[in-house]
Amino acid sequence: MTTHIHQAWELAKQRFAAVGVDAEAALNQLDRLPVSMHCWQGDDVAGFENPQGQLTGGIQATGNYPGKARNAEELRADLDQALRLIPGPKRLNLHAIYLESDTPVARNEIKPAHFANWVAWARERQLGLDFNPSCFSHPLSADGFTLSHPNPEIRQFWIEHCQASRRVSASFGEQLGTPSVMNIWIPDGMKDTPVDRLAPRRRLLAALDEVIREKLNPAHHIDAVESKLFGIGAESYTVGSNEFYLGYAASRQTALCLDAGHFHPTEVISDKISAAILYVPRLLLHVSRPVRWDSDHVVLLDDETQAIAGEIIRHDLFDRVHIGLDFFDASINRIAAWVIGTRNMKKALLRALLEPTAQLRQLELDGDYTARLALLEEQKSLPWQAVWEMYCERHDTPADAAWLSAVRHYEQHVLSTR
C-alpha cells in the first residue's frame, strides 16, 4: 500500500468520524453501485451493422480524433483498457447495432447468438450487460418515425425489432445472473409544427404495449422507456415526450429513463428523481452533460452530477435506480472520455456517501436552515479525495491522473496503428 495514501486515509477517517460518517462503510456501499458504461463512446455510435452509414435520429458525434474502434475486437480491447483504469463495479450498455454476424441481419431478426461474444467477454470480466434497441440509422427510420410510424408495415418492423431486443436482453440477464435493463428510445418527431399531435402518440402507445406484451422474467430483464425534448430535425415535436413516457411507465409499471440532456436546459434530472420514483418501480439514469442542447459531452464532477448522486444516496435508492452514462465525444481520446466520465460518476457517488445526511436532515426538520447551509458547504472541504484514493488503491487502479499515462501508452502502441 502506498504510504501517503495510507496516511491520508487514516486522517480522513478521523475527520469524517468527527462529523458522524463512517468512511469505511462508505467504501463498502460504493461497491454496491455499478455504473453502466456505454459502448458507443468507443466508435461514435457507428456500430457494426453498417459502420460507414450515416448517424441519424437527431443525434451527433462531433470530432474526428484518430483511433476509433472499427470492429468488435477493437472495441472490446479499448473497453478493457478503460475498465482497468476505473475502480469498482461496472456494467456495459450495448445497442443492437453492435451485433456480430458474418452475414447481414435484419434488425427485427436479431437473436442472442449475435451477441454471444459480448456475453462471453462480460462473463470473463464479471460484468453485467444492459441493452437497447437501435431505432435510428436505418432506411426505415429515415423519415423520422419508427414505433409511431403511420405506415403499419414499417411500424410493425420496429415493434418486432424491440420484441427481438427484449429477448436478447433477457438472455443477457439469464446467462450473467444479473438483470439487463433494456431502454427504448426512439427519434420520432417533426421538424416543423404538426397538425395532429395525438395520433402518433396513440400509435406509440399501442406499439409499446405490443412490444412488452411477452412476459419476461424480471430477474433477467427490465423494461425502460426514455423521453426527449427535441432532436436535430425534430425541433418542433417529439412523440415520446416526458409526459408521455412518465404516464406510460407509471401505468405499465416499467422503469423510466431520465437522460440529463433530454430536457429543457433550465431543467435538471436530479430534481425529477424523487418525484418520479413515487410512481414507477425503477429509474434508469443516463448521466450526461448537455451544453446548450443534448450535446452529450463527457460527464464532469459538477454540481448536477453531484446532485444526481446525492438523490440516489440520500433516499437509499440503491436497488431502484440504475446508473448509466450516455455521452459520445469524438474530439478527444475515446478511452480517456470513458475513464474521465465514469470516474467522475463514481467520485460523485462517494462524495454523497460521505455526507452527514442524518445530521443535515435533522437540521432541516428543525427549521435550522442556517446550520443546514453552513454544514452543507463545510462538508465540501472534508478530505473525500483521500477516501477516493484508498478506494482506487484497493481496486488496483491509479488513484490520480497517472491513468492518463496508460491511455497515452495505449494510444501510441495500439490506437495509432488503426
Swiss-Prot record:
Pfam families documented for this protein: RhaA
Q: Which residues form the signal peptide?
A: none
Q: Name one GO biological process term.
A: L-lyxose metabolic process
Question: Where is this gene product found?
Answer: Cytoplasm
Q: Which GO terms describe its molecular function?
A: L-rhamnose isomerase activity; manganese ion binding
Q: What does this protein do?
A: Catalyzes the interconversion of L-rhamnose and L-rhamnulose.
Q: What is its EC number?
A: 5.3.1.14
Highest taxon of source: Bacteria
Q: Which cofactor does it need?
A: Mn(2+)
Q: Give the cofactor note text.
A: Binds 1 Mn(2+) ion per subunit.
What is one term from the GO cellular component aspect held by the record?
cytoplasm
Please state the pathway this protein functions in, per its UniProt record. Answer: Carbohydrate degradation; L-rhamnose degradation; glycerone phosphate from L-rhamnose: step 1/3
Record-given protein name: L-rhamnose isomerase
Q: Which residues bind Mn(2+)?
A: H262, D294, D296
On subunit structure and binding partners, the annotation says: Homotetramer.
Catalysed conversion reaction: L-rhamnopyranose = L-rhamnulose
Q: Which UniProt keywords apply?
A: Cytoplasm, Isomerase, Manganese, Metal-binding, Rhamnose metabolism
Instruction: Tell me the protein family, please.
Output: Belongs to the rhamnose isomerase family.
